[in-house]
């Protein structure tokens, strides 16, 4: 079975390494952790970095697998997984997401609103150096070594891609919730209760609407899949076998 894990903002596929190490070599051999276009390398020609472009990119990754896949997403990766699974349930064997969801009542966090504002977003990005970003990631629950690694990839093309992505998503709560009833039933939500960006109530409402199991983690932040990699791995293995 093929598994695709999708990172979020402002991350790289390296954020999945603690989970991959825990899952073991047999599972990891059939696991793909692609970088979002524009994050690890310059934006491909013709790719506009909107939320719809990233969903199309993920669906193309799923189609290339040649069989239904297990999808796993965190942060923006979670939003993309839910949307892609809603649009193409025929390509999905199972899905699991953490610490971000398209939910009707959710309002974007403060940093997102800044990024969505022309000029202010560019200024904020310019003032966010790599050291500041590393400290911010660590404060939100990411291990310091990984936070430093992720911050080292804080490039001009990543910053531009992030601004375009967020500005395309001002109305995501309305635009991406109408098809949730099409989600495959084999889903799982994993959550860090102390997430400063997306409150656990968002997960509770989403899971109640979609009848999806919610696994909460006390004293865990936004990067729950890193902080609790062994626990998440155990849940995923059972989820895939069910």
What is each PLM-predicted segment?
Residues 32-72:
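Active-site loop/oxyanion-hole signature of alpha/beta-hydrolase fold enzymes
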Residues 1-43:
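Conserved HGGG/HGGXW glycine-rich cap/lid loop of the alpha/beta-hydrolase fold
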Residues 86, 94-123:
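Flexible "cap/lid" loop of the alpha/beta hydrolase fold
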Residues 106, 127-181:
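Conserved alpha/beta-hydrolase catalytic His-Asp/Glu region
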Residues 158-207, 216, 225:
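Conserved serine/cysteine hydrolase catalytic core
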Residues 4-8, 74, 191:
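The conserved beta1-alpha1 loop
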Residues 73, 77, 81:
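Gly/Ala-rich beta-loop-alpha elbow adjacent to hydrolase catalytic centers
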Residues 220-233:
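Catalytic histidine-centered segment of alpha/beta-hydrolase-like enzymes
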């Amino acid at each position: 079975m093929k598994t695709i894990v999708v990172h979020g903002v402002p991350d790289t596929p390296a954020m999945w390494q603690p989970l991959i190490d825990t899952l073991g070599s047999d599972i990891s051999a059939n696991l793909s952790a692609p970088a979002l276009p524009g994050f690890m390398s310059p934006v491909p020609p013709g790719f506009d970095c909107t939320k719809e472009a990233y969903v199309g990119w993920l669906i193309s990754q799923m189609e290339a697998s040649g069989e239904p896949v297990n999808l796993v997403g965190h942060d923006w990766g979670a939003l993309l997984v839910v949307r892609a699974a809603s649009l193409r349930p025929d390509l999905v064997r199972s899905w699991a997401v953490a610490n971000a969801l398209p939910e009707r009542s959710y309002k974007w966090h403060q940093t997102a609103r800044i990024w969505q504002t022309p000029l202010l977003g560019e200024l904020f990005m310019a003032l966010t150096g790599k050291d500041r970003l590393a400290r911010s990631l660590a404060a939100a629950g990411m291990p310091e070594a990984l936070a430093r690694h992720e911050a080292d990839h804080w490039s001009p093309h990543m910053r531009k891609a992030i601004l375009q992505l967020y500005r395309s998503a001002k109305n995501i709560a309305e635009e991406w919730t109408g098809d949730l009833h099409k989600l495959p039933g084999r889903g799982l939500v994993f959550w860090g209760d102390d997430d400063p960006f997306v409150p656990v109530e968002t997960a509770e409402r989403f899971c109640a609407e979609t009848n999806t199991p919610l696994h909460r983690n006390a004293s865990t932040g936004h990067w729950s899949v890193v902080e609790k990699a062994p626990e998440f791995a155990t849940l995923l293995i059972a989820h895939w076998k069910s």
